[in-house]
């Protein structure tokens, strides 16, 4: 019934109730001038033409024409909330960052969950990795831990990221999602096997945002107060327990409630059922990194928990919904390069690429002064630097302080204790191909040891159900990769594909050689 709906459905009703004792505000233009009539446009007579002097109309339309800002190129569909992080265990022997300085310390945070490939209006229940980004408002500035709900990723080299995302989005001619593009890229880059296997497992469709884990995914460096450094990975374990959606339920919800994840999160917080996660770290010394059997900075691989156990750190609790979605969720900007002293990047190639890409896309989407937007502002510290001006500078622009450095007028100076950790680096400058690195050992362990028989069956069914729509030559390349992981893995998928291909023979296709010249149409079966 309309009188007993959930908090998200009753948002307008609750807003009115909260203002019950207040008189309605006076309607104004954007310039604050009172408006006498908002329902009828100004004309010459009841049937005459409009007048340019109707500033009520022009003010409204001019703003309406500019309401939309560029959509995020990835992670466009998302839900956000505000929270606090509380330290429960001492890790100061590893990290000097003040966010961890003593047990019981609380830090305000903002969190955004998202899908990756879909547009802003896409469904929350698609099979897709989920973004899990956390913004810590610390007294040493912003710390953005920008991760996913998976501990690994599809690629290990940042140069491939634009092509990878293009392959997951829409065909440039048809504007349709294209299984050929997706599986062609995945099959040509076997390092994607680990993430693809995770994606098509049960965890590929989480039950909303509250029932999934989060991971920093990358390898980071922690530095303690004595200048000693270790490598680190961050993990958020959901306190609500892991829950996933079946393929059938996900398909149903994508039609009945495409905003299922957003609604579920909003209602949980609105009713006081605050979701929480426990933060853990894994630690690896520099000496251990040198003897690690894989590249410890490879984003397509994990650190085994038996060798590098989880160390508890603290608790993240979501306890406030956004007051306004655009102001606090659409405009929030996460940047992996925002790191306070004590937290630094590792040589992880993907992380290194993101250090540039994320702030660059924010400057495009939100403007060069996006850090002045309230939700992005490092409000718990004083920003003092030599950056000035630019579009939409809405502060005092640091007044009359010098805008050059060095200077002789008591302007901001360096803090030597904030110097980065010194590390040794050597090698020949070059472009190093990592395609043939071990891409199967950890995937084999995932398939044979992590998954049970029923989970393996569903994994193979999910992969075959998606791969069947790709051309046969792409199917063959993909199956070969799965065979390399384990014969059972590849054989199961091939058996399912054989059935699909008999039921739905492939139609004629057109292919193009690399330089774009046209080839004659061929049957897919002959490729």
Curated annotation (Swiss-Prot):
Residues annotated for NADP(+) binding in this entry: 194, 201, 203, 213, 237, 303, 305-306
Residue span of motif Microbody targeting signal: 524-527
Compositionally biased tracts (Basic and acidic residues): 1-22
Record GO terms (molecular function): catalase activity; heme binding; metal ion binding; trans-2-enoyl-CoA reductase (NADPH) activity
Entry's EC annotation: 1.11.1.6
Entry keyword Phosphoprotein: yes
Sites bearing Phosphoserine, chain numbering: 9, 434, 517
Residues with the N6-succinyllysine modification: 13, 221, 306, 480, 522
Keywords: Acetylation, Heme, Hydrogen peroxide, Iron, Metal-binding, Mitogen, NADP, Oxidoreductase, Peroxidase, Peroxisome, Phosphoprotein
N6-acetyllysine PTM sites in chain numbering: 233, 306, 480, 499
Modified residues (Phosphothreonine): 511
N-acetylalanine PTM sites in chain numbering: 2
Residues annotated to bind heme: 358
Subcellular localization(s) per the UniProt record: Peroxisome matrix
Cofactor dependency: heme; NADP(+)
Keyword Iron found: yes
Region (Disordered), start-end ranges: 1-32
PANTHER family membership: CATALASE
Stated family: Belongs to the catalase family.
Known partners and oligomeric status: Homotetramer. Interacts (via microbody targeting signal) with PEX5, monomeric form interacts with PEX5, leading to its translocation into peroxisomes.
Name of protein: Catalase
Naturally occurring in which organism (per UniProt): Cavia porcellus
């Amino acid at each position: 019934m309309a009188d007993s709906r959930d908090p998200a459905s009753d948002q307008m009703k609750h807003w009115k109730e909260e203002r019950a004792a207040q008189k309605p505000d006076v309607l104004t233009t954007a310039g604050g001038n009172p408006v006498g009539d908002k329902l009828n446009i100004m004309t010459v007579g009841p049937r005459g033409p409009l007048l340019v002097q109707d500033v009520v109309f022009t003010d409204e339309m001019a703003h309406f024409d500019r309401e939309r800002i560029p959509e995020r190129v990835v992670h466009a569909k998302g839900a956000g909330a505000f929270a606090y992080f509380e330290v429960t265990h001492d890790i100061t022997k590893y990290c000097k960052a003040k966010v961890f300085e003593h047990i019981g310390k609380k830090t305000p945070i903002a969190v955004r969950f998202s899908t990756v490939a879909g547009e802003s209006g896409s469904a929350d229940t698609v099979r897709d990795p989920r973004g899990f980004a956390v913004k810590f408002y610390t007294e040493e500035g912003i710390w953005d831990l920008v991760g996913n709900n998976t501990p690994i990723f599809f690629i290990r080299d940042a140069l491939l990221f634009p092509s990878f995302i293009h392959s997951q989005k829409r065909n440039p001619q048809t504007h349709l999602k294209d299984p050929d593009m997706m599986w062609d890229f995945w099959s040509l880059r076997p390092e994607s096997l680990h993430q693809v296997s995770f994606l098509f497992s049960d965890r590929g469709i989480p039950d909303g945002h509250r029932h999934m884990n989060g991971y920093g995914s990358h390898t980071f460096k922690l530095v303690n107060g004595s200048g000693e450094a270790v490598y680190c990975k961050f993990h958020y374990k959901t306190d609500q327990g892991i829950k996933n959606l079946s393929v059938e339920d996900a398909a149903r919800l994508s039609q009945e409630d495409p905003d299922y994840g957003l609604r579920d999160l909003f209602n949980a917080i609105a009713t006081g059922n605050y979701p929480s996660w426990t933060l853990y770290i894994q630690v690896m010394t520099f000496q251990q990194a040198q003897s690690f059997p894989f590249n410890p900075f490879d984003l397509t691989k994990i650190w085994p928990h038996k060798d590098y156990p989880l160390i508890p750190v603290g608790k993240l609790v979501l306890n406030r919904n956004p007051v306004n979605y655009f102001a606090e969720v659409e405009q929030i900007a996460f940047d992996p390069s925002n790191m306070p002293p004590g937290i630094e990047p590792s040589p992880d190639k993907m992380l290194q690429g993101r250090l540039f890409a994320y702030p660059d896309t924010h400057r495009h989407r939100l403007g060069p002064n996006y850090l002045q937007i309230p939700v992005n502002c490092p409000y718990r510290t004083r920003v003092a630097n030599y950056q000035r001006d630019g579009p939409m500078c809405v502060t005092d622009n640091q007044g009359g302080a010098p805008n050059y450095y060095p200077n002789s007028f008591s302007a901001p100076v360096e803090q030597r204790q904030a110097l980065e950790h010194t590390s040794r680096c050597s090698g020949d400058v070059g472009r190093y191909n990592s395609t043939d690195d071990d891409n199967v050992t950890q995937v084999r362990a995932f398939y044979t040891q992590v998954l049970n028989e029923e989970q393996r069956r569903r994994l193979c069914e999910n992969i075959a159900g998606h791969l069947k729509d790709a051309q046969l030559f792409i199917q063959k390349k993909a199956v070969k990769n799965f065979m390399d992981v384990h014969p059972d893995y590849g054989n199961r998928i091939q058996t399912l594909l054989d059935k699909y291909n008999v039921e739905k023979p492939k139609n004629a296709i057109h292919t193009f050689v690399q330089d774009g010249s046209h080839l004659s149409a061929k049957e897919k079966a002959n490729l």
